[in-house]
Amino acid sequence: MQYIVAYDFGTTGVKTCLFSIDGGIRMEASAYAPYGLYILPDGGAEQDAGEWWAAMCSTTRAAFEKTSVRPEQVTGISFCSQMQGMVLVDEHANALRRPMSYMDQRAGAEFRACQTHGLTISGVNAGMMLRSLAATHAASTSVKDPLWKYKWVQAHEPEIFQEAHKWLDVKESLIARATG
């Protein structure tokens, strides 16, 4: 029998499921653990990468304890998560500061300085939007987008910005930590 562990990292907790995958897909066990969402008075919304990791570890143990499945029987791991977060990490994938949630709205000034001048479409610079759409099929049109969080850290926490090796989203930071 082969098994997959699936993690779903939501805004306030993780659900971990253990599936058997021989001859179909069947959920064998699941577990849930909450973690914090820290709303700051300046529009910030942060989480704690250590809390994500602790919740992942505890729910993994709990799911396995509900079955006779052994970890070596797991042939795959899947992650899905909230999007548009920002986790600044060092070379070892350690978070340098609390991750900024998709709900964080502190970067209004950085967004406006770059996006709201010249000809605009829905408040966003038309030329920048069209170039971005042509190159990536996406455009950063909200203060909540990770680009503006990155620019906010650059302006307000330059020492952390200088230490950052990579900028990752939620699930990518957890994959990096889990895989080294």
Residue ranges and their predicted role:
Residues 1-98, 109:
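N-terminal glycine/serine-rich phosphate-binding loop of ATP-dependent small-molecule kinases
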Residues 61-180:
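Glycine-rich phosphate-binding/catalytic subdomain of phosphoryl-transfer
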